[in-house]
Amino acid sequence: MAYDLHGSWENKIGHHSQYRPHKDDPVGDIASTNYAVQYWTGKGLPANKLVFGMPAYGRCFSTNVDEPRVGDPATGASPAGTHTKEAGFLSYYEICDKIENKNWKVRYSSTMQAPFAYGEGQWCGSGFKTISY
């Protein structure tokens, strides 16, 4: 599983599907897909037996920080999406809508090798840079 590494159940912002860990990641190096792959292959599991699940959604936080980043305080889950109707969770298309119509900013962390977006007091980690729309 290469997702749900973080979420609104935590009190600090964390990317739920980062490839590499961020230095300010609240749980350290273990919250990355690279760590999971290295762990299992290190235990003897052949790499060709691994199935790598990728998310088409974002785990999202509410925050009071103007330009939020991993490790910043979260005030809770982001509001529920129009279609998904679950706090702290936005579908890929709901994130795209926020980027296109609500002027959310998109950033890419070369450290985590993962994209994220933020705006309107919310922060979402997702795979939208790696999936074209």
Task: Please describe what each predicted stretch is.
Residues S8-R20, D24, M54-Y133:
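Glycan-binding loop/region signatures in secreted carbohydrate-active enzymes
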